[in-house]
A protein has these predicted regions:
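Conserved N-terminal substructure of TIR/SEFIR domains
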Residues: 1-70, 88-95, 103
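Juxtamembrane regulatory segments of integral membrane proteins
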Residues: 4, 90, 94-141
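Short catalytic/ligand-binding loop motif for oxyanion handling, primarily in non-cytosolic enzymes
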Residues: 14-16, 76-79, 105-111
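Acidic, low-complexity intrinsically disordered regions
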Residues: 28, 50, 76, 83-84, ...
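Conserved TIR/SEFIR loop-to-helix hotspot centered on a Trp-containing motif
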Residues: 73-92
Length: 141
């Protein structure tokens, strides 16, 4: 796959943090002779002018090994982010869906084996029952 990961985020909430995450991932264990250690897709660095925005995004999703979701209440409400999440869950395993919590709340209910939606604000409800066990996530709040 051309991309190791696809970064899904809200420009309003994480427009400054997403480029930093991409930059850091490019630099992890980078051999001196390579430009980057892995290719990471982020809309503002990998998309060019095109008559079909969604088809370009869908192509990048198809070509990505992991989905990095920068979780925030703003991202959870974003129509574009929800489309990306829907595509990933319909075409890939939740095992390759990684969560980076940037703001808001995320809570797991061990009894229900699902997120506690009365507390969780940073995830779209489409993730209800998507995971078979509590996901380990990175908390950057």
């Amino acid at each position: 796959m051309p991309y190791k990961a696809f970064i899904s985020y809200s420009h309003a909430a994480d427009g400054n943090l997403a480029p930093a995450i991409q930059y850091a991932l490019h630099r992890i264990a980078k051999p001196w002779y390579r430009l980057r250690s892995m290719r990471i897709f982020r809309d503002q660095t990998n998309l060019s002018a095109s008559p079909g925005l969604w088809s370009s995004i869908e192509s990048a999703l198809r070509d990505s090994e992991f989905f990095l979701f920068m979780a925030s209440p703003t991202a959870a409400q974003s129509i574009w982010v929800q489309k990306e999440v829907d595509w990933w869950l319909s075409n890939r395993s939740a095992q390759s869906f990684l969560i980076i919590l940037t703001e808001g709340e995320l809570a797991w209910d061990n009894t229900l084996q699902d997120f506690d939606w009365s507390i969780t604000t940073a995830l779209p409800h489409r993730l209800s029952k998507a995971f078979t066990e509590e996901p380990l996530y990175i908390d950057l709040r």
